Amino acid sequence: MNPNIQHINTKIAKYKKDVVNHPLYNQLNSIEDVQKLMEIHVYAVWDFMSLLKGLQIELTSTSIPWKPIGDNKIRRLINSIVLEEESDVDSDGNPAPHYEMYLDAMKECGANTTEIEKFVDSVADINLPKVNTAIDSFLATTFDVLKTGEAHKIASAFTFGREDLIPDMFTAIVNLSLIHISEPTRRYS
């Protein structure tokens, strides 16, 4: 591994551990608790897609007329992540973005998707509608990074703040939820 990446991983290890072992996960004792978590976390799912699109804009060609820009390997990596995030295959074999799959999962467990759907519908450029103080602050931090247009900052937020962290975080949530929650989820149809 690149020594610079190792250095960053060492520096952020404590913070990653804090997120993965957050006491909030132990408080997921009912399906209602999971619904509430999802109703808040969905903004991070949307935010993740915004970071990814920021990387795509900075490191690949998204302009008309098209021109090849940047490193071929980086373009391929970014575009393959975009393909996976925007056009993955759901459990029924249909193409669907991860964001929309998350909304479907929210609906399946009875979580409210109205607020995030209104939020996304009303987003214009990078002027974000207000949600609540915590979500607004989280999104403002991301969009401050995106506004810099600096690929290394966007890539750092994407990689170390999302892509590298999310699998461990979800594993912790799922494991604790399986222990604490015995109610079946409702099937959205």
Predicted features by range, described:
Residues 58-66, 113-120:
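Short, charge- and proline-biased low-complexity linear segments
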Residues 179-189:
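Single conserved hydrophobic/aromatic residue that forms the stacking wall/gate
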Residues 70-76:
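Short, well-ordered alpha-helical segments
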Residues 4-19, 29-65, 84-89, 145, ...:
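Alpha-helical bundle segments that constitute or directly flank the non-heme di-iron/ferroxidase center
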